[in-house]
Amino acid sequence: IKKELPVYTSEVSNAILTSYSSDDFYAIQQPGNQIQFTQSIDSIHLAIGRIPARTIAEANKMVEKLIQYQSNKKMGLWQNQLTWVADDADFNLHLQDAEEIISNLKTKTANWNHKKLYLDLFKASQTLTGNTYPDVNKAIQESIQAGTLLLNYTGHGNYLRLTEEAVISKSEMQSWNNTGKLPIMVTASC
């Protein structure tokens, strides 16, 4: 695995709130179409994704996970569970984003159970290093262990953690023991 396909970046890539990266660019099949920030997902004609692997061994491990997921030996109610995590601050922007997505889903189907783990709905604990949300951390862990089809996060983050308070960290994710109940994980984050 030596060549990488670059991610499409919006033409105005220095705008703080409206810049984005998307592989949808590679799925637009009609000539003249361009990705726009307000464009409906209905105009995409092909599902596209990536296997985040840098070595053959990593790729094989990911393919094995996909095969296990496809064979679906642990079917159950967990597949109707959608978990929403929204960062605090920013005038509730992240909470509003999550609510808008949920509202759109509810117009298409009402068969989902929505578990909302919005930081603004929980009490913060103050420590010497800053705020933490232990109840959110615990609720996320419980949701992952019980099984959730989707874990959607909107807010600040990086490759090591989501939220300044680290409600999800890389080390926590590596400790998850949820084989057979892997969530689709979406992060709308910096």
Predicted regions, residues:
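Cysteine-dependent hydrolase recognition
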Residues: 1-190
